[in-house]
Amino acid sequence: MKFPGRGSNLLPIVNELGALPGLELQELFTFLILLLIASLRVGAFLISAPFFGSRMVPLQIRIVFSFCLGFWILDTLQFPDQNTLLGPKLILIVLQELFIGLTVGLVLNICFAAVTLAGEKIAATSGLAFASQVDPNGGGQSPVISQIFFLFLIVVFFSVNGHLIILGLIYKSFEFYPLGQFTSYGELVSAGLSASDILFKSAAIIVLPIVIVLLFVNIAIGFITKSAPQLNLFSFGFPMTLIGAFLILFYSVDAIAFAFKDLIQSIIDLVMSLLVEPSDG
């Protein structure tokens, strides 16, 4: 197969590819289009999901990983006919895949924000709000406790294979949201409200026991300073509050880990109802 302009320097690579036996550029172009479409849903998720979409993971790695996953699932997907892929509906298919992947990543971000919110409230109650630094995930300032909680949640998430479960659910979502078949996406929109419910409920479960104990510590410090006025409230109460906060967090590690595990289970159930069982969600 020869291409016009063989002697031209404009398309030497294309001409060399056309000279290879058994290789049609139309087939190569179609394969690249299919690979791109298969990678869009996973790639959009990796860009918007927590940890995967953070600045700690370079964009090039996320793009390569999404194309690798797209190549892996390419043979198992049912694609529309070639005329649909090369027609105006291709734009709608691309937008559909991006919408589904970004929605799943946004849902995970909202749910993962529960530990950040819990850390901010604990830091404000214990006097550790001043101990803040740049958050590598969002780029803004956040308390150190929030960042420790977030890293702890990431460790628990990977330890229970949550990342593999979520990626598996995204793969199964092609059965309920096939390529090129535009159905109702009301479940994807309502998933944000369910994620917000998980956000505040999980944050309250994590925060309330620690904050209540710190409240009793502050009440005890108030009685002590009231009975002994010579004690300075700031020189005595502030260190005692910090020590109490550290002790409470130290002895609450197991309980916090179980709370994080329940949060991850709620996230998996929400994503499952969103992608795999939309009719039951």
Give residue spans per PLM region.
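Hydrophobic alpha-helical segments and their helix-loop boundaries in membrane
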Residues: 2-281
